[in-house]
Amino acid sequence: MRGLLLAGALGLPLAVLAHPTHHAHGLQRRTVDLNSFRLHQAAKYINATESSSDVSSSFSPFTEQSYVETATQLVKNILPDATFRVVKDHYIGSNGVAHVNFRQTAHGLDIDNADFNVNVGKNGKIFSYGHSFYTGKIPDANPLTKRDYTDPVAALRGTNEALQLSITLDQVSTEATEDKESFNFKGVSGTVSDPKAQLVYLVKEDGSLALTWKVETDIDSNWLLTYIDANTGKDVHGVVDYVAEADYQVYAWGINDPTEGPRTVISDPWDSSASAFTWISDGENNYTTTRGNNGIAQSNPTGGSQYLKNYRPDSPDLKFQYPYSLNATPPESYIDASITQLFYTANTYHDLLYTLGFNEEAGNFQYDNNGKGGAGNDYVILNAQDGSGTNNANFATPPDGQPGRMRMYIWTESQPYRDGSFEAGIVIHEYTHGLSNRLTGGPANSRCLNALESGGMGEGWGDFMATAIRLKAGDTHSTDYTMGEWAANKKGGIRAYPFSTSLETNPLTYTSLNELDEVHAIGAVWANVLYELLWNLIDKHGKNDGPKPEFKDGVPTDGKYLAMKLVIDGMALQPCNPNCVQARDAILDADKALTDGANKCEIWKAFAKRGLGEGAEYHASRRVGSDKVPSDAC
């Protein structure tokens, strides 16, 4: 499964960035290739026009009980013999579409990769749905009756050995939780927090059902869910990694890196509609440091997991103004400026995403959700100059209610070294892993971008959002952009091609994925598809060069923010572990929900140009491309 560069990390196209160079506090990097343990891609995605199982409702008004009942009835209609439970993360998106998630069960245990997401339209009817429910035979024997499976300690030992995690288990013991066959481990060293284990079923790649222990281990560089066979205690059937790799003197929003403009002093930069407590309060306490409701930023030179007592600048008069020079060395000499920049960029992005629909109910990152739904206690831990690696960055996204964790590294490809916190595109790329992981499959499920193609799209969304945000006033359809060029000191950036609407400059299409088996390379293809979409919508609606969108009837009035909004809404519509064809359909459906399909032509043309037109197909062994625009699209 996902190592640092294979999930949530910003990597170079040809393995220029291998792995961070060192670790701290005894947390060892495993040597096993987690990529080989990815869960397989098996979801279906169907919109209302394709569905023969549309469920009408006569309820009024649109209430939580009614849309959950509508969604539940659809699942019963589609798979009448399945047993399942409602996941408690349903909500109504800013586009008026309600999202409800279900988990299949067998003998009272979760089938952990059998998910069903239902999207209910504003009219109370099914808008679209996706699922990966198991349709084979459920074992007759209830494992909880016979109880001949291995114990959780054996499962943890088996996980430790199979993945070479270097966890010390000499004093290990278990403590039962309130959930069925669920345990916390005590007396363990080598992990950030106590490991956990829960007995669940898993649909294997061959389509059969296996009883497994789901073992959760946060070893800092990787935050793993390992599905280990409950009968043998040794065979690993799958692994999920949550890590995808006042006055502020900063590079202002829209300046991607120091080559694009000077630092300026910005006063009270927060959007009060998105950050009700400002950036330096959490609703309970007011701070004079880089800490607040949305994030807590600090230095982390040792690369450790502790952060509350780490150094952060303190300004009683709230003047976060610190010196920084491109020639300054060593990096710790400008740590105050680095922390301030990271805090500013992450908070600004939080506020922008909030206005585009990534709010409390959708699973955003906030300590206090102010009574607006979702699970709180999950601001983003922002580590500047993190000592656990170099030439990279990463973001860990656990489910809603647990803090996200971003690590920004020093880049050593230049003299003097460069600090990744000063390249906004890297910060935005990493934070977008949190966005896409929380929205896809619902806030309570952070393992829905784990398959190779969906994981690649996770990287692509990060590149796309970073690029859309850095557009300049004079840019046109023919403007090209690179990724990570400043930090890596690499002309042309860290992807194989610039993002471009020219097939000569960037020849990548959907069938290029047939030759790719690494998520960053796959992501570069997806990001360029979205770059085509971005410019088609800008050409139609114009471009707002301001720091936040303007809306009319809930729809961004310009093409740039409209593209970002449709991409975000599509994440919430698509199934768990989607492929590119399904993600395309979800974006089309997002436009249908938001604008009644007013941009269908522009969207189809963008996808068709890059091989994702009508008739494009995903298969596990190959992709089939198409440049066809549907006859009714334009």
UniProtKB/Swiss-Prot annotation:
Belongs to the peptidase M36 family. This is Extracellular metalloproteinase NpI. The active site is at E430. The lineage of its organism: Eukaryota, Fungi, Dikarya, Ascomycota, Pezizomycotina. CDD domains: M36. One of its GO terms (molecular function) is metalloendopeptidase activity. It comes from Aspergillus oryzae (strain ATCC 42149 / RIB 40) (Yellow koji mold). Zn(2+) binds at H429, H433. Binds 1 zinc ion per subunit. One of its GO terms (biological process) is proteolysis. Residues 289-310 are annotated as: Disordered. It is found in: Secreted. One of its GO terms (cellular component) is extracellular region. Its EC number is 3.4.24.-. Its cofactor is Zn(2+).
